[in-house]
Amino acid sequence: MELIESEKADKVFILDFLMEYQEFREKDVIVSSNIQDLESFCEQAWDASSKERKTLVVFDEIHNYGKKCPPIEILYRFGRHWNIEIIAASHRFADLPMITRSQTQQYYVFQVTEKCDLEFLRYSLSKEKVEQISNLADHKYVVLEF
């Protein structure tokens, strides 16, 4: 929650499997677990956005539904023009949708030990940085900027 609060968004949309659809009007937060209606969720976020106020969209476990998903791709490609910030969470780099990898500038990375993910990181990072990531302690992270 610290990361979300630091964004200081006027409206927050969270797609999370574990929660029921709720709207907290006093906090301007919409939480949905309905991945069957991604188009509606993304449209609500788009409609709430404007150049004058920040809209934050959070996709939890994006690897489960974000691959080749036109509504999510639209938010990634054009959202920055309408002050939309996106946070996407996933367990593994290799499972991130291509649109997420290509449009993300900052990653918060916890310990990575999976060989496939370490190989992915080696293409973009120094050997020392990959080593640091593979040896991170529990609940510690590094910020990567691309």
Regions found by a protein language model. Name each.
Residues 1-5, 18-21, 30-129:
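Conserved P-loop NTPase motor cores
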Residues 4-14:
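Post-Walker A helix-loop "phosphate-sensing" segment adjacent to the P-loop in P-loop NTPases
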Residues 10-11, 54, 139-141:
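Short, surface-exposed beta-edge/turn micro-motifs
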Residues 13, 85-87, 142:
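A structural signal for isolated positions on well-ordered beta-strands in alpha/beta enzyme cores
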Residues 26-27:
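Exported/periplasmic cell-wall-interacting domains
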Residues 119-146:
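Phosphate-binding and hydrolysis-coupling loops of NTP-dependent motor/remodeling domains
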